Amino acid sequence: MPSTYPRLSTLAQWSSAGPWQAELPHSCPHHALIWITRGQGRALIGGVRRGVGVHNALVIPAGTLFALDVGRQGFGLVFEIPPGGAALMPDEPQHLRLRDVQAQAELTAILDAMQREQNTARPFLDEAMNAHAALLSVWLRRTMIDHTDDRPARPTAAQRLVTAYAALIERDYRTGKPMADYAR
């Protein structure tokens, strides 16, 4: 259920209606940071399939077509951030493979603090969660700068085509257009 302030949940809580809820391509009205802490699997983000595993962070902007399958043994946290808030989130999906123990510890500490705050449900929870989201945003932008060498310099033509197609499907699927209209 979408919230007016950022929320943290486990992958199991996030897909509580069943694994299909995360495994089938869909989009969400809010930004999400997914932190995988156990297991491995596949993610489809913006039409591009990627392998995910332990210490991977996925940043999914609001309205991005995605699917996530980490299997039954997978575990992780999902931090959902409503768009238009204090936290600045990237416009493009990000897949960060955090090999540095310091970066892993920083992210874990931020998420642990969020979880403690959310579980105590004290007054001004919304303000506290927005402040934590802003801190996470700073950490994320710093980490993205540190990982610029990990990303390919330029996506291939096939990746650009499938990303554009996925964005078109996400934008127009509610209109009832037949598939033939998307092939033009």
Segments predicted by a language model, with ranges:
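Short beta-strand His + acidic residue motifs that chelate non-heme Fe in jelly-roll/DSBH
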Residues: 42-44, 52, 60, 66-71
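Append "Primarily bacterial transcriptional regulators
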Residues: 55, 181-184
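Short, Lys/Arg-enriched, Trp-marked, Pro/Gly-tolerant hinge/linker segments that flank
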Residues: 97-102, 121-128, 140-181
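Regular secondary-structure segments
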Residues: 37, 108-119, 166, 170-173
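Generic protein-terminus/edge-of-domain signal
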Residues: 1-53
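A hydrophobic/aromatic-rich effector-binding and dimerization subdomain
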Residues: 1-11, 65-121, 137-146
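Tight coil/turn sites that cap or link beta-strands
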Residues: 19-20, 54-55, 61-63, 73, ...
